[in-house]
């Protein structure tokens, strides 16, 4: 679905900090939402955790930066990083071009997904949250 | 309620807006990176109508300014624009500004929006009776046209021969039919102009809007995001971030604005004392190997704390993090290696004297066949 020009795919899980998560087999792929990317305007630098690094739900796992601003990325779930999107080192603009596709950040092997997924939003929940945010 | 410029009607429909110095201004229209590179490779336009513009006129105008700023004023010919500083009694920088000399006793003083009120108070406090200092900010608009394509973009709108208007010269002319003051100045490091459109108020913005829209046919509208990244890449300090009333011109690496041997201006006695010894810190540039430095980040030298970042960004030309900072004497030599602390880890960086780009390829001195 789409809220005021911001794309929100139906099949992802979301946080109120504007990250998305998607189950890909045993791993969970993580990125930032279209809204987050557009608010940053032009992503020029990505600092992601290393492979095998541990991430913890709702704790900072890296930063995404535009020319003007720094945005923390909070882990939507806990686990161990199994893959990092290295293409972003040379092409950080992929986050703006394709936040849910080529602009993904990391893949994590989850340690507590069944419990933690309860605190994530579905597309409708995130859309409703975004709408209240944009009304302010 | 924030104030708006005469061109707000254009920005509000097309730009992401931000509040700056009490004005609602465009932050970007498309992306900061694209607008930045449009100025480096072609031409861009900026609404800078928020900047303060004061007319200083009358028999005592030259004498007044001569005693106010460290630059020589009387010897400047009419038609000259010059960069200078307002200093307090301690030699600290109240603001940096451009003075355009229109006639022997007639000047337009262009100052930072955030300091306009303080500047006016400082000027009034030092002005002799009978001198007119008139705030023209609300009755004029101001548009910067910047980049290697600036001449051709602006020349379409005016009979003034822009090829004959040298850098830091100004002339009154009609632009898109409107009376204006055109100066070959700017804040991007590129060739370009600043056009002050007379007779433009919020109630009657049409003339200024016509100038802007005609320029937008051949130049890319740019927001404050690109204005900041461009000035930083050129190494120009921003007052309020890179210098303030506690910084003197020697520390800010702006001692060149002090005319040789000039005395008797506000702050001169304090500067004579501080100029006799090397400053304990000096403004420099940093280029990082990785990461983006930001305002307030700590700089470490071999012997520990060496200074602090006062503004930082990602350079679209270098594709690296760059910063302006103040460094202690031992670490300030260009070519020195230092560390910038970014979220707890030290990132290696090289000390430079900006501009950050290669002047053979970018900026107003660039080789024309590029």
Predicted stretch roles:
Chain A
Residues 50-64, 75, 80-83:
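Short, well-structured beta-strand-loop connectors
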Residues 67-102:
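Mid-chain, well-packed structural core segment of small domains
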């Amino acid at each position: 679905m789409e809220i005021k020009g911001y794309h929100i795919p139906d099949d992802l899980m979301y946080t109120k900090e504007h990250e998305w998560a998607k189950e890909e087999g045993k791993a969970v792929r993580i990125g930032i939402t279209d809204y987050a990317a557009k608010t940053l305007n032009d992503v020029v630098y990505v600092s992601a955790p290393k492979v095998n690094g541990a991430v913890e739900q709702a704790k900072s796992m890296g930063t995404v930066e535009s020319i003007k601003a720094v945005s923390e990325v909070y882990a939507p779930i806990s686990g161990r990083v199994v893959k990092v999107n290295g293409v972003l080192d040379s092409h950080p603009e992929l986050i703006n071009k394709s936040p849910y596709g080529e602009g993904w950040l990391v893949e994590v092997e989850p340690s507590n997904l069944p419990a933690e997924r309860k605190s994530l939003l579905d597309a409708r929940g995130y859309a409703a949250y975004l709408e209240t945010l944009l009304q302010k | 309620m924030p104030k708006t410029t005469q061109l707000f009607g254009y920005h509000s429909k097309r730009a992401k807006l931000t509040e700056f110095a009490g004005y609602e201004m465009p932050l970007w229209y498309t992306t900061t990176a694209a607008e930045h590179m449009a100025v480096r490779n072609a031409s861009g336009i900026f609404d800078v109508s928020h900047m303060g513009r004061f007319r200083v006129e009358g028999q005592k105008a030259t004498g007044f300014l001569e005693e106010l700023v460290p630059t020589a004023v009387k010897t400047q010919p009419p038609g000259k624009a010059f960069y200078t500083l307002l200093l307090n009694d301690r030699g600290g920088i109240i603001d940096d500004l451009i003075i355009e000399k229109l006639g022997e006793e007639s000047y337009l003083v262009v100052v930072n929006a955030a300091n306009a009120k303080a500047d006016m108070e400082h000027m009034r406090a030092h002005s002799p009776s009978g001198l007119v200092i008139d705030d023209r900010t609300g009755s004029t608009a101001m548009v910067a046209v910047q980049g290697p394509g600036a001449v051709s973009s602006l020349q379409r709108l005016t009979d003034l021969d822009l090829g004959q208007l040298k850098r830091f010269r100004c002339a009154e002319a009609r632009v898109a039919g409107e009376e204006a003051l055109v100066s070959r100045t700017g804040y991007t490091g590129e060739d370009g102009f600043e056009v002050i459109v007379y007779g433009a108020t919020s109630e009657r913005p049409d003339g200024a809007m016509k100038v802007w829209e005609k320029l937008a046919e051949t130049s890319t509208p740019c927001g404050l995001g690109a204005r900041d990244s461009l000035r930083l890449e050129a190494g120009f300090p921003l007052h309020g971030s890179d210098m303030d009333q506690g910084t003197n011109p020697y520390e800010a690496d702006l001692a060149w604005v002090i005319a040789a041997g000039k005395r008797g201006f506000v702050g001169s006695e304090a500067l004579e004392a501080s100029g006799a010894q090397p400053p304990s810190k000096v403004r420099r540039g940093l280029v990082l190997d990785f990461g983006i430095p930001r305002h307030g980040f700590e700089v470490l030298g071999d012997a520990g704390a060496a200074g602090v970042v006062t503004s930082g960004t990602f350079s679209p030309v270098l594709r690296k993090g760059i910063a302006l900072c103040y460094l202690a004497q031992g670490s300030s030599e260009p070519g020195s290696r230092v560390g910038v602390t970014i979220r707890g880890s030290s990132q290696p960086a090289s000390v430079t004297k900006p501009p950050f780009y290669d002047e053979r390829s970018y900026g107003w001195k660039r080789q024309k066949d590029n």
